[in-house]
Every structure is written in structure tokens, then in C-alpha cells.
Amino acid sequence: MNGTEGPYFYIPMVNTTGIVRSPYDYPQYYLVNPAAYAALGAYMFFLILVGFPINFLTLYVTIEHKKLRTPLNYILLNLAVANLFMVFGGFTTTMYTSMHGYFVLGRLGCNLEGFFATLGGEIALWSLVVLAVERWMVVCKPISNFRFGENHAIMGLAMTWLMASACAVPPLVGWSRYIPEGMQCSCGVDYYTRAEGFNNESFVVYMFCCHFMIPLIIVFFCYGRLLCAVKEAAAAQQESETTQRAEREVTRMVVIMVIAFLVCWLPYASVAWWIFTHQGSEFGPVFMTIPAFFAKSSSIYNPMIYICMNKQFRNCMITTLCCGKNPFEEEEGASSTASKTEASSVSSSSVSPA
């Protein structure tokens, strides 16, 4: 084995020289240069600095503006809450531990950090799935006369929390476990060992299939069908400028959504699966650290894509930030009036996130 396994930890370094120490008790500067820990702390500070305001602003603006309190926006609020879970439960902890060079908060802190980071990430992931399904149901109309209402939104919220809990809770109660990973300053599911009594193998297979592959398939299916529906509508109305513009807007939005989804989750899932299927192989601490923090950056991508690209929310946000007046409202209003010169069966409001 090209690593050192101990009680509730796995260090990706063979202890031939005797320098490997528990990540709960000693700085891990023998793994990488101390400057790397400083860089990690600075990166987490950046995520906190950007992630907290944009997600808090999402909650505040929605509460302040009654017209934003729509059933679909419940899911967007859920997304913001999930991101705040990651900010407070994961980012602040990792920033603090990276400043010390090891997981100074001990086993309890590792469990809490791993749980909140996993819970927040999974709530966000399944919220994106609910959004994708809602867009597919409304635009493609597989069920005629379907209208997304408050009851549907509540069921969607319940599903996101249920699925997230089904992923984050088991390691706390003995099905797998949370251990320090990468540079040993943050905690995640144990992909690294076959520790007796924890059934890591079955949990990793379950997590990869049910909490990565299934969401990925659903998102690709829903947005793929959505894009086809817009193209079909545009082909049926070749002279409709509004429809052509809607097609371009939806195409851009879908491409950005899919790319962001893959950038956030595919590197982490791929590396975790490789480590799991090649246990005992040699890899460095940075090998798992970089993908893990790509996934954490979803707390910034999500609100930018799913909320800031929503014109109605953007106008309300500008109004709030500018103390009740939107300096761009008149210009946008004129543009909106000009764009409504021709009716269309598919409009940008029908295919935007909200």
C-alpha cells in the first residue's frame, strides 16, 4: 500500500521514514509545502467572501420582493440555503484548519465538516435536478396542462432534503465514515480504505450511482429535451424573431448549466472513483484536494447561473442594492416593449430558470 492507514485517517504517503503523523494532532507540512496550506486558506476565504453575500442576497431579495415568492423560486431559495450550509459548515472550517496545517478540530469536527459539506452539496445537486425536471415538465409538456404549483415545490424541497440526508447521514452512523482527505484539512467520505466494519465499498457504489450518475442522467435528459423543444418551435416559426432569440438564450443557458455541472462534480467523482477502484495505488495529497474544491466552488456557480441570469430577479436585486430604484429599468423596459412586437409559443420567460 502506498499510504499510511491509521485510526480514522489515511495519509497518502508510506511511513518508511517515520515522519507520518495523525492529521488530528500534528501539522501535515511534510505532505506539501506550507505555502500550499496558505493558498488553500486564501481560496476558502475567497469562496466565503463571494459565496456568503450572493447567497444571502438571494434570500433577502426574495423575502423583500413579493413577486419573487413563486413556487419555482422556493427551489432557488433552497439552493441558496444549501450553499450557505457549505459556506458556514464547510468553508469556514477548512479555512481555519488550513491555517493550522492539519485538522485541528479532531474527530467530532471532521464528522461535522464532512456532514455539512456533503449535505449542502447534495441539497444543491438535487435542487438542480428539481429545476431541470420542472423546466422539462413546463416547456415540453409530457403531461398536458401541467402547472408547477406550491404543492409541487414543497414536494421538490422535501425530495432534495431526503436525498441529501440519505447521502450525508450514513457515514455518521457506521455505513462508511468521514476522514480527512487530500492535504488533510477537510473531510469527506472514505474512498481510500476498506476499513473493517464500515462497509466502505458498498457505500461508495451506492453514493456514486444514486447521488451522481442518476442526477447527471436526469439533468442531461431534461435539458436535452428542453433544447429540442425550443429548436422545434423555432423551426415551425422561421420568421419569428422572438422565437429565434429565445432559442439562442436557452441554448446559451443550457450549455452553461451543463458545463458548470460537469466542472463542479465530474472531477471530484472521477478522482474519488479512481481512488476507490485503485486502492493502494500511489497518489499525492493534491490529487484529491483540487477536485474537492472544484466541487465546493458550486456555491458560487449556482446562484450566478440559476438566479443572476433570471431577468426578474436581477431587476429586483439591482433595485434592492440601489436603495429602491433601478437605474437600468427604463432602458430594459424599452427593450422589453420592442421585443414583444410578435407573439410566440416559446418565450424566454418560458424557458428561463424562473
Curated annotation (Swiss-Prot):
GO biological process, one term: absorption of visible light
Molecular-function GO term, any one: G protein-coupled photoreceptor activity
Transmembrane domains' residue ranges: 37-61, 74-96, 111-133, 153-173, 203-224, 253-274, 287-308
InterPro entries: GPCR_opsins, GPCR_Rhodpsn, GPCR_Rhodpsn_7TM, Opsin, Retinal_BS, Rhodopsin, Rhodopsin_N
Keywords, comma-separated and alphabetical: Cell projection, Chromophore, Disulfide bond, G-protein coupled receptor, Glycoprotein, Lipoprotein, Membrane, Palmitate, Phosphoprotein, Photoreceptor protein, Receptor, Retinal protein, Sensory transduction, Transducer, Transmembrane, Transmembrane helix, Vision
Pfam assignment, any one: Rhodopsin_N
Protein name: Rhodopsin
Species the sequence originates in: Mullus surmuletus
Gene name per UniProt: rho
